[in-house]
Amino acid sequence: MEELKTIREVAILWKKDKQQYVKLSTLSAYALILENHILPIFGDKRQLHEKDVQDFTLIKLQEGLSQKTVKDILIVLKMIQKFGSKHNLLPMAEWSVKFPTEQKKNVLEVLSIANQKKIMQYVKENFTFRNLGVYVCLSTGMRIGEICGLKWSDINLITETISVNRTIERIYIIDGGKRHTELITSTPKTQNSLREIPMNRELLKLIKPLKKLMNNDYFVLTNEAKPTEPRTYRNYYKQLLKQLHIPDLKFQGLRHSFATRCIESQCDYKTVSVILGHANISTTLNLYVHPNMEHKKKCIDKMFKSLK
């Protein structure tokens, strides 16, 4: 049996192994979790005890991290533990962590129908390529990185679809203790995120006259060979909301607004899930489908009618 190593030493070997299988952006996220959360507490330990992990969890929650963020940190910790045990670098350890009951569920923030119409009308009357990106997001539910990565070649006027082929993001690179950021273009979040989305009539009206004049290799938001990055575009979007006197809403709220309007229009959940590029339908159901009392009553009434 090899000599037991510290969590820090195992993490280095684990990262090297992971490098072969995951995207650079995922590896970067793992590195940040290690540097900011795991290694400062567990780096010098040669064994993980359930009590230590439970205490760590509660401390992170008290620091203001959400349960989802803490769970993501624990997933990385568990992967390192499994890797270490498999290669006889750490002792076998099973631990289960309990989370306090959440008092209230986070409600997704979306645009009101009036404000959504206001933005879409403004874009039609005040065309810029950056404004077009907001309209595209409200019409397709694309993520900000996907919008930034959209090229004119991804827009097909014959099939009237947009192909989501790439995403742009700025990632942290940690190299020998030194940190720097890098803007990267990569494939979208998951295999399901590579998708084709139909364009509605209004979006086609905006895009059709432009598409024929544009260089296919150019990015839509800049109409240049160089893209804009999500942070810059997010700042522009915030200014747009301010200008239109619309309450502050995260850019992701545009995607949520699109999905919510689809569900409100009684689109079937599987189709909405595919359009959004979710890994599975349960993500869509958990995020957007929340039947109210009236819906529940109708469901039960419908069931009893079928018995007659």
Question: Where would I find each of the regions flagged by the language model?
Answer:
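N-terminal core-binding DNA-recognition domain of tyrosine site-specific recombinases/integrases
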Residues: E3, R8, K15-F83, L89, ...
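Hydrophobic recognition helices of helix-based DNA-binding modules
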Residues: H37-F42, L77-S85, I207-K211, C262, ...
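DNA/chromatin major-groove-contacting recognition/catalytic segments
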Residues: F56, Y122, I174-G177, N286, ...
